[in-house]
Amino acid sequence: FAFDELTTLMNTRSYQEDSVERTFRWARRCVDEHQRLTAERLGKPYQALYGVVQGANYEDLRRRAASQIASLDFDGVGIGGAIEKRIIGDTCAWICDAMPENRPRHVLGIASVDDIFACVENGGDTFDCVAPARCARNGAIYTRSGRYNIKRAQHKFDFGPLEEGCDCYTCRHYSRAYVDHLLRAREFNGFTLATIHNEHFFVKLLDDIRASIDG
């Protein structure tokens, strides 16, 4: 990703405008440097570069920033910055409207299931977030029926998988009771096993979304 300035929803509109322009200036410099380095690396694997669109909750700033990034020779776009949950789908739509169809749209920092659906419906292609691993460390387990805390008392003697029907490594080999025990003891294996399940959940979710679109 090209260098950008991540603002917060607490920054003023005036600051957000300055930030959009600053990010655009940095983006142009990044493209120039990327082209120079690509020429130097002739014959080596190509390294893609994405530009990042900022603008907080302001539709006009998001559209302006998207048009600016679209005007540069990026391989794709990153939809970044702080966004209120209620307009996350709208924000994706504002930005994707300005993007060429052949450029991938990556939404940064999204891991809520409903947010993923909102973004996909409005043009988002790929996603990243630390939440599956961060939540796993605290005992939060994602399932098709919602998220639950494995460290609650009812799971202490539950010898079933973290999620019925899940074919991840953790669910095929370990029980809720065992993962609960490891997390309570703060054993690193507990963090790892819970993370494996959560990451598998999101990979499978996106696989199913992709299959639904292709179908």
List each model region and its residues.
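Short, small-residue-rich loop/turn micro-motifs
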Residues: 4, 73, 183
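Glycine-rich phosphate/ribose-binding loops and adjacent secondary-structure elements
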Residues: 21, 37-39, 44-162
